[in-house]
Amino acid sequence: MTVPPVPAATQPRSILVTGAGHGIGRAIARLFLSRGWRVGMYDVDAAAVAAEAGGQPLAEHGTLDVRDAEQWARVLEAFCGERGLDVLINNAGVLSSGRFVDIDLPAHHRQVEINLLGMVNGCHASFPYLARAHGQVVNLCSASALYGQPGLATYGATKAAVKSLTEALDLEWREAGVGVRSLIPLFVATDMANAARNAASVRRLGVHLTADDVAAAAWRTVHGRQVPLRSPHRSVGGQTRVMAVACSVSPDWLTRLMVRQTAL
């Protein structure tokens, strides 16, 4: 379907946020809404996003299970219509922590299906709308993508895949004028971090970021200058920046030692 773009001056910029009912997604939706954006708030928890939208004229909401490609198509058509999409925030995610063999197989599969395949579904379905607006994708990644974390094995694997997906699509979609970025926080004070509170790395490194910190990073990322050869990844918080630099310059044996000391 080829539809001419609507001039930007006639409408507010648009952002669609997955997992917008709670935590980081909710904080991002609130921030962009407070600054005059048209915000699509979607979550498997329909009641949460309905309450959050609260009848605000620039807030739209609905149910979205990111694992369902057909649901993605319906949501995008309903929210975007003949308009493009300025920003997609791929935030929906789940986490199961513990020793790998102690976590049941359905929980491992659920993390892969939501954290990775849900993001693949969203990127694939939203591309025509993003291309129309020369928009951006912001993928929620994690510091667990920097090196495999014992106790968070499958979760970290999904986030490492998200990191790779971000890099590939940012290069592949550049000719269409679509930027792809990732946000890489360490542990954030949300229900998800609470679920991982028994992981050794959470206990030793602590939880020093809030959902609002990540939302502010999302705002800066969306409004940052696009530099062709700059990394698409944005570390959130001082701890994460130090970890990212350390992982990039340290020999593998030293990185393994550091991870072992914090995660075991």
How would you describe each model-predicted region?
Residues 123, 158:
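Active-site helix of classical SDR
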